[in-house]
Amino acid sequence: MVTSLIVRLVAWSVRRPVWVVVLSLLIAAFSGVYVARHFKINTDISKLVDAEPQWAALSQAVDRAFPQRNGTILAVVEAPAPEFATAAAHALTESLQKQAAAGRIGPVAEPGGGPFFEHNGLLFLSPQQVADTTSQLASARPLVNELAKNPSLTGLATTLSTTLGQPLLTGQVKLPSMAKLLSRSAATVDDVLAGKPAAFSWRALVDNDAARQPARAFVTVQPVVNYGALKAGAQTSDVIRETARALDLEKRYGAVVRLTGEQPLADDEFSSVEDGAALNGVVTLLVVFVILWLALRSKRMIASVLVTLFVGLVVTAALGLAMVGSLNMISVAFMVLFVGLGVDFSIQYGVKYREERFRDERIDHALIGAAHSMGMPLALATTAVAASFFSFIPTAYRGVSELGLIAGVGMFVALLTTLTLLPALLRLFAPPGESKTPGFPWLAPVDDYLDRHRKPILIGTLAVVIGALPLLAFLHFDFNPLHLKDPHSESMSTLLALKDSPEAAVNDVTLLAPSLADADAAAKRLDALPEVGRTTTLSTFIPADQPEKRAAIATAASTLLPALTQPPAPPATDAQRVAALKRASDLLGYAAEDHPGPGAAAAQHLSQSLAKLAAADSATRDRAERAFADTLRIALNQLAALLQPQEITRDTLPPPLVRDWVAPDGKALVQISPKVPKGVDPNDDTMLRHFATAVKAAEPGAIGGPISILHSANTIISAFLHAALWSIISITILLWITLRRFGDVLRTLVPLLVSGIVTLEMCVVLGMSLNFANIIALPLMLGVGVAFKVYFVMAWRAGQTGLLHSSLTHAVLFSAATTATAFGSLWLSHHPGTSSMGKLLALALTCTLIGAVVFQPVLMGKPRVKRAKNQSQGINE
């Protein structure tokens, strides 16, 4: 009945080709207008997975209470010295706050910086650390006084000369204790002389953490997002970069601003997908043209196939938008699917038409004969493929669910256009007749070999596949989405550089507590877990033992503030600067000779460097002035601020800081960071899994970070398992209804399952992990695999033998080559996730093709009935 309907449909199209073509083009035109007016793509990746109500409620509660924390952009200010990094971050923050007031961007903050931390930083040390620090500062009063009196290159050279005089001779100062100062000074002068970015950090002399290069400071910006654009946060990122350029931070401080955070990571991900897409698309199209030529051997046939594909694709796009409203970053892949499988249908019909045309020159008869031969296989393949795609609709993975809906409908569109528009176009274009039947006659000996050794090959294949099943225990799912991002993109490279920095907070999880008291209690419980490295609440910003600390700071301030606030000396002339540098160079040389041992080499090095600086031009000395004196002035101002702390209470905390940790309704946030053992990668999957499990067990309300990622991974894996189960059940029922023989159903499904199992086994052998991106390849290959298996089992049921060198294999191989080109081009993508999907698609397609072309004929054996004589020509029985 189905075959009869298809033959009548094709016959009707062949008799009225002009009407069919005109009607198809009109439908395509209307569909194109609809797509142009309604095309939308939602780039919000948080909407790709439908969370369970409980999980969604936890996440939404945090987002409602602290909306300013969602999708933040972290601007990382890098400079040669921490003094410059801090100053550049201050300047950037002040300027961006004006942009925020104008509504161009969201709220701006400076985590760990700003007036609050500048004045109260010492209060966050322990009482003993405060006592030691203030004692050292007080004993350094003479040096501080000299530096503050003349904070210039001349003043520094003079102070160094003074220190190398009487204090060194009397033993008050020892050369080894000056080694760090001298060696770092020499390195900075050398950078100045070499024309490199240079800055001398005074903080780094007493703080080893400040000596890390490059020095960093941070600014957070809440982006204004547009999920209708490919890069939703691009506007805010552009404002930040424009502001940094306008401030000339690189010239003033040697500072560079790099952006990372949730939104820049998403934006750069889409950029990496887009990068090279045009070139890959052109190359792919050219390769597809070549494959179509090899398969069809006719320009007119190729033109007919391409027009059919275009019409079907536009109609599918219109139907897809009508069904789902807007595409997402996964469902947009329906285009690749449609091209891959749409070409398959067209090639199957086209190759069969060529075979029929070889036997009968009459084009009408050949077109109808091809429909009679391929109508039922195409209809069954279409329905089976659509069923496999529709199996994803009930799952919680919305991205793939919508892809399954659109792709499934698209299969029926592809079938309809293949059986109407394609025959009509071929009738109008009237390709020339065929001189030989399609196929691979040179593969006939292989067919004979497989037929003679069927049982050993079958048993050996199944033994290898079953024997390798234990490998599946080592199949790894990489749940970390950061591994799917381009490590060379600005946002990802910056994040990797920050992997040991608490400001990145990539792997932190959060807990929303009813009050600050509850948050503090939860933090105390979580601190006891060995997997937890640090917890933070608003109370973290209210230091303990403040009276004791403030008293120690006040004692130091009484001696140091008068020196720090004295008016500086007037600027020296360049001649005075040269004289001071020469004197310091000479004294350093004498000190190195008179005090051999530790520190002498550094003194000699600096002596030579200062001599070169004195002999250089004034512009070089001006750069040295900025490298030493500018950072000194900033450091002295920071020291003066640190010596003037305020009492910190809940009421005196800055309102923006309070708002980041306590909501207006009193709910409070706990931020929990993992404990990273020494030598372990902060993004290690096993460590993060243990951390997430421990925190979730202790506090079921915890959400975010690895907890949310693991939940999403479990949801996606569950979605694919359920979809695979429903797909197999639906395909089995469909095959049973159509084939009416349980053995024939197994002859279709067993090669499909074997191909899938071998694909996963090869993933283990080749070290390929499954991830959020490439797992999508499995249902795609399920659809392609079902189609191939159906073609072969239907040909076998019709009595066809010698399948390997038949026109069917000719069509399947070139169809697979086209699909491989469409899918395999993803392998060349700059985006690691897309590239991994291309790799898995290539592997899965290879396994599927071998399963269909080689294993399935061996499994089926000789057909039950001989092929009808009128269909046997051109086929080696």
Swiss-Prot record:
Domain SSD: 302-428
Keywords assigned by UniProt, alphabetized: Cell inner membrane, Cell membrane, Lipid transport, Membrane, Transmembrane, Transmembrane helix, Transport
SUPFAM superfamilies for this protein: Multidrug efflux transporter AcrB transmembrane domain
Residues that span the membrane, as ranges: 17-37, 280-295, 300-323, 333-351, 374-394, 400-426, 453-472, 719-739, 744-766, 775-794, 810-827, 837-858
InterPro entries: Hopanoid_biosynth_HpnN, MMPL_dom, Mycobact_MmpL, SSD
GO biological process: lipid transport
NCBIfam families noted in UniProt: HpnN (TIGR03480)
Protein name per the record: Hopanoid transporter HpnN
Organism annotation: Burkholderia multivorans (strain ATCC 17616 / 249)
